[in-house]
Amino acid sequence: MENKKTIYFLCTGNSCRSQMAEAWGKQFLEDKWNVYSAGIEAHGVNPNAIKAMNEVNIDITNQTSDIIDATILNSADLVVTLCSHADAVCPSTPPHVNRVHWGFDDPAGKEWSEFQRVRDEIGEHIKRFSETGE
């Protein structure tokens, strides 16, 4: 019987950071967590996010850019906002939903090295969370 918790990664456009977080989450957390991502808006998956994750042998070409699903939001065990905009405007969550903010810079429109840096920072944070719960 599967009894996984649900983690929901949110950012503004569900294009870069939350896509990377979903991929890293599936890499490090999938045995204990159902992993989803969404945005305040759906901007499509950024091609550089796909390229950055391919560099670490994680394929996100089949991930979709989605707007926040109220059902997932209200039933998640943990909601993680990845940018200050999502943290500020994310719909309110019920008291039983643990909500935290892990801020990462937006690499969109920046140098390629920013995508790599943000990818690695998100991956390290999620790996640490998988090991320590923090």
From Swiss-Prot:
One of its GO terms (molecular function) is protein tyrosine phosphatase activity. Keywords: Arsenical resistance, Cytoplasm, Disulfide bond, Oxidoreductase, Redox-active center. It is found in: Cytoplasm. The active site is at C11, C83, C90. One of its GO terms (cellular component) is cytoplasm. SUPFAM superfamilies: Phosphotyrosine protein phosphatases I (SSF52788). Its EC number is 1.20.4.4. InterPro entries: Arsenate_reductase_ArsC, Ptyr_pPase, Ptyr_pPase_sf. It is an enzyme of class 1 (oxidoreductase). One of its GO terms (biological process) is response to arsenic-containing substance. Disulfide bonds join C11-C83, C83-C90. It catalyses: arsenate + [thioredoxin]-dithiol + H(+) = arsenite + [thioredoxin]-disulfide + H2O. Belongs to the low molecular weight phosphotyrosine protein phosphatase family. Thioredoxin-coupled ArsC subfamily. HAMAP family: Arsenate_reduct. NCBIfam families: arsC_pI258_fam, PRK13530.1. Catalyzes the reduction of arsenate [As(V)] to arsenite [As(III)]. This is Arsenate reductase.
